[in-house]
Amino acid sequence: VLLNNWEATHCDFDEDRLKQLFDGARQVGAELFLLDDGWFGNGPYSRDDDKHGLGDWDPSTKKLPKGLSYIAKEALKRKVGFGIWLEPEMVNPQSELYQKHPDWIITQSKREPILGRHQEILDLTRPEVQAFEWDIIDKTLRPNPDITYVKWDCNRYITQPGSSYLQPADQSHLWIDYNWALYRLMDRFAKGFPNVMAMLCAGGSGRVDYGAMPYFHSFWPSDNTDPLGRIKIQWGFSHFFPANTISAHVTRMGKRHLKMAIDVALSGAFGIDLALDKATAEERAQIADAVKLYKERIRPLVMHGELYRLVSPYESPLASLSYVSTDKQKAVVYFYQTKDGNEPRVMLGGLDAHKKYRVEEVSLAKGVTSRFPANGKVFTGAELMEKGLENPLNTQFESAVLILVANN
C-alpha cells in the first residue's frame, strides 16, 4: 500500500515537508511512500515545474540538501518504505541535458519540434542514449539501497517520428528499434535491481503491454481515477491482465463519496494519492480503516484469488465482481452503483456449493449498520450461486464490500 505525494505537493517540497508526509503515511498504515516528480534538477533548471529539469537527474540540492539516502532513511525510521519517480526516456528543452545534446531527441529534420507536457522524447536507437538512460537508473538506485520502489513514468507519446542517428533508409525502423532498446533497458533494470518493486506508468494505459510485464509488478491503467470511470476501466483491464497488476488509488477526482473511491480502489493494488494533511480527521480515519482492512483481509484475495464478473457496468446500474480464494474458503464481493436503479439480486460465482459461508459487510464507517439482509448470516455456496444475494443499493455512488468465509 503506497502513498504518493503528488497531490499534496506537486514539485513544491523540502525535507521537512516530506517528513510530515511520512508521518501521515505511517499514521494511516501505508507501507511505502512514493516521492513523485520534482526531486531533481539544479540551478536555472531546477524542477520547480514541468517545464524545467527533466533529463538532469542529480537530486535537487535546494529541496534535498542531504540527498536521497538521507530522506529514504527518514521514511524508514517511521517504518515506511521509500520509492521514487523516474522518467528516463524524456527531456525538457529547459535542461542541461538538452543544451548539451539537442540532437538526442526524436524529431524530423527541418521541422520545429512539437512538445508534449513541455518535453521531448530521447532517441533510444542511439547507443549513447541507451547508456545515458541506464546511468540514470543505476546512479539513482545503486548508491541508495533503501529505495525499494520505482514509478517509471511516460508522459507523452511519439510525434514527428525521426532519428538523426538512423540512416535515411532506416527511418521506418525507429518504432521497432526504440521498443527493443526500451525492453533491453527494462530487462537490465529488473535484473540489476531484483529487490526493487516497480510500476510502469502512462496516462490512458499507454504503457500496458505483455512485453513489459516481465519487468514490472504493476501498471497504471489510467490517469482517470474518478471511481465511475475506473469501474469500467478496471472491468475491461482485468480481461487481459491480473488484478495484482492494476494500480488502483484513492484520489479526489470525480463527484463521489470517499467510501466509493475507497471501495473501487480496494479491488486492485490499493494506493493513496491524497493530501492527507488537508483531509478531515474523519477522512483520515476512513483511509486508515481501509488500509488495515486491505492488508489484513482483502489483499490476499485480490492478489491471488480468482476473478468472477457478476454484474456488468455496461448492462446494469450496478457493477459487481468478486475474488474467490483458490481453496474456495474465502471471497470478497464488490457492489458499485454507477447510476440510480436497482439490481435486485446478485448471483455469486466460484464458490464450493457444499460449503457454508458467513456473509459480512466490511468497509463500513463507524456506527453505520449494514443494509444487506444477508449480513451476519450463513448460506451454502449453492444458495449464493443459485439464489444470490439480495442487493439493497439503488442510488448512484453507493457501494459495498462483502467478505465471505466458509465455516469449517
What are these regions (language model features)?
Residues 2-135, 144, 148-149:
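Aromatic-lined carbohydrate-binding/catalytic grooves of carbohydrate-active enzymes
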Residues 262-311:
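Catalytic cores of secreted or luminal carbohydrate-active enzymes
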Residues 38-40, 101, 155-158, 167, ...:
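Active/binding-pocket-proximal capping segment
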Residues 3, 33, 75, 198, ...:
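Conserved, mostly hydrophobic/aromatic
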Residues 92, 98-131, 135, 176-278:
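Glycan-recognition surfaces
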Residues 148-159, 200-208:
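Short acidic/histidine-rich active-site segments
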Residues 339-408:
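C-terminal beta-sandwich/jelly-roll accessory domains of carbohydrate-active enzymes
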Residues 313-354:
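Carbohydrate-binding surface patches
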